UniProtKB/Swiss-Prot annotation:
The gene is kaiB2. Coiled coil: none annotated. Gene3D superfamilies: Glutaredoxin. SUPFAM superfamilies: Thioredoxin-like. Belongs to the KaiB family. InterPro entries: KaiB-like (IPR039022), KaiB_domain (IPR011649), Thioredoxin-like_sf (IPR036249). Disruption phenotype: A kaiB2-kaiC2 deletion mutant cannot be made. It holds the Pfam family KaiB. An paralog of KaiB1, the major clock oscillator protein in this species. A metamorphic protein which may reversibly switch between an inactive tetrameric fold and a rare thioredoxin-like monomeric fold (KaiB(fs)). One of its GO terms (biological process) is rhythmic process. This is Circadian clock protein KaiB2.
Length: 108
């Protein structure tokens, strides 16, 4: 398990706790991490913590968040818990799925 912290000195802002479940360092897992890191850097202003959980090393941890597919991103905080499956390459879907940006489903 690897912890990657990017916390700024300003602790007044809410820290996003994100957990990325992967199965080793496959191309899809690496892509998911790169995409997640890019999104966090751009939209969360350094107020995030990413925890990488490799289920090939710790398969029992999949039970805690009911992980059925990989890679899976779990937003632990802020609540409610949210999950996104895949390589996180569609930035807009990730932003909406994590509720960083509101859904733009409506048409004018």
């Amino acid at each position: 398990m690897e912890n990657l912290n990017a916390l700024s000195g300003n602790q007044n802002l809410e820290v996003w706790q994100l957990r990325l479940y992967v199965a080793g360092q496959t191309p899809k897992s690496v892509t998911a991490f790169i995409n997640l890191k890019k999104i966090c850097e751009e939209y969360l202003n350094g107020q995030y913590q990413i925890e990488i959980i490799d289920l090939t090393q710790q398969p029992e941890l999949a039970i805690e968040d009911s992980i059925l597919a990989l890679p899976t991103l779990v937003r632990k905080l802020p609540e409610p818990i949210k999950k996104i499956i895949g390589d996180l390459s569609n930035t807009e879907k990730v932003l909406v799925g994590l509720q960083i940006l509101p859904s733009m489903d409506w048409k004018i």
